[in-house]
Amino acid sequence: MKDSRLDQFIHRIKAQRACLNMAARLVAGMDGPILELGLGNGRTYDHLRELFPGRDIYVFERDVSAHPDCIPDAAHLLRGEFKDTVPGALARIGAPAVLIHGDIGSADTSRDAELAAWLGPVLRPLAAPGAVILSDRELGAAIWPPEPLPEDVAPGVYFMYRAVALA
């Protein structure tokens, strides 16, 4: 029997939390900001604030509609389409990020694939050496090598990469 959409959502959110918690451990000794691509309801942003107290967390969002307690201040919110806000964002954030998280999936899988194919290369200059990149869509091993997922996360549910120089 196929999982219901609710079950699929729960699996994805549990995977997201497990990956974020693992990423927090992996970057604990590194300096730099956190990037959140897509604010949505603000749940992940809120979790990132818990994981990284005192760190700058920059959020990229087209249409802010999150819970009021989960909206970053204007200095940390890059409002607009990713294609307008992500390229050149390094000037605004001031330093490469140690963690980049993208929750970019939608019901339109062809749009998601196109966005992920574009996004992977554009994120390279925003990632510090050794940064962790997480996404609910595959960004491509040609951009960064895959990082092992937490043992309770099924392959294909979430994607984790490490920013290293590729030959």
Describe each PLM feature range.
Residues 106-167:
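C-terminal substrate-binding/active-site "lid" region of AdoMet-derived donor-dependent transferases
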Residues 95-105:
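Short SAM/SAH-binding signature in class I
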Residues 28, 93-94, 126-127:
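A generic alpha-to-beta junction signature in SAM-dependent methyltransferases
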Residues 42-46:
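Glycine-rich SAM-binding Motif I of class I
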Residues 1-33:
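Class I SAM-dependent methyltransferase Rossmann-like catalytic core
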